[in-house]
């Protein structure tokens, strides 16, 4: 009870022992404002659960320098759980072919279909197995600021090198609310802001990015609006990664982008590295454009999921609502692989045309 008294609370028992008062005193008690003798809310009660130990933390500049970041696919077992063996093979292949970072649980990795327990576990697994060889950037963004805070705290506690944050979608907010949302997570560690209005239905305008860029933890922007926006930022010294694979060559070499956060690099990581590192290469870009068009004919990650299954590096298991591309498109993919060269693609099996019956669609997992 002594602890309760410190917060200005009165027990029911003690209330029974108040002396009987006259009518005026009773009236005053009913209408008086209750004032706590000690503030009930400790001022720093909601500080983030962050460690003050910085010796193993990634410097924001280490994130800003990355040119090829793969939005890594999450493969599944037939019962819908993560296939960690296949996942590890995918990440190892990225490392061997020169990718410098992976986005864990992004749109491509289907973070939107994961529980937060699954999501944070996969970030921790990736850090534990590969954190010394590749930068691990966890997609800990959410349209709920509360969830974004909690997930980002846990992700950095797991050892991720950076966070990817999207603006609040569906329940859209004001410009001021958008800025406030990002400010709550920026102080936790290196952060990439993700602008993809095609999915969120709300653009992050330059005025927000310019304000956020004053925070030293803002590593840069994954920008999907287009190259004019990319150049608007790079001219002011803001680091930008193209979020559009079909524009990333020109973004890099004509508009100042640092690199790309790529879906296509799940399939051809070596060629995507070449596209970002070895100077302007219009011939290679033209060679890859048909593959990129094929990948995004339906919303991502449908195309990459289908392709990795046909290449034999991931089981043909889809978490609904995603379903594979139709048979005619699967036949097209086999032709694309042969035109580009099987040796450039991940895995070592022959590319196959899978039948509809080969795919497993999971609704409960």
UniProtKB/Swiss-Prot annotation:
It is found in: Plastid, Chloroplast. Pfam families: DHDPS (PF00701). The gene is DHDPS1. GO terms for biological process: diaminopimelate biosynthetic process; lysine biosynthetic process via diaminopimelate. It comes from Arabidopsis thaliana (Mouse-ear cress). GO terms for cellular component: chloroplast. It catalyses: L-aspartate 4-semialdehyde + pyruvate = (2S,4S)-4-hydroxy-2,3,4,5-tetrahydrodipicolinate + H2O + H(+). GO terms for molecular function: 4-hydroxy-tetrahydrodipicolinate synthase activity. Residues 1-39 form a transit peptide. It is an enzyme of class 4 (lyase). The lineage of its organism: Eukaryota, Viridiplantae, Streptophyta, Embryophyta, Tracheophyta. Keywords: Allosteric enzyme, Amino-acid biosynthesis, Chloroplast, Diaminopimelate biosynthesis, Lyase, Lysine biosynthesis, Plastid, Schiff base, Transit peptide. Its EC number is 4.3.3.7. The active site is at 194 (proton donor/acceptor), 222 (schiff-base intermediate with substrate). This is 4-hydroxy-tetrahydrodipicolinate synthase 1, chloroplastic. It comes from the Eukaryota. Catalyzes the condensation of (S)-aspartate-beta-semialdehyde [(S)-ASA] and pyruvate to 4-hydroxy-tetrahydrodipicolinate (HTPA). Pathway: Amino-acid biosynthesis; L-lysine biosynthesis via DAP pathway; (S)-tetrahydrodipicolinate from L-aspartate: step 3/4.
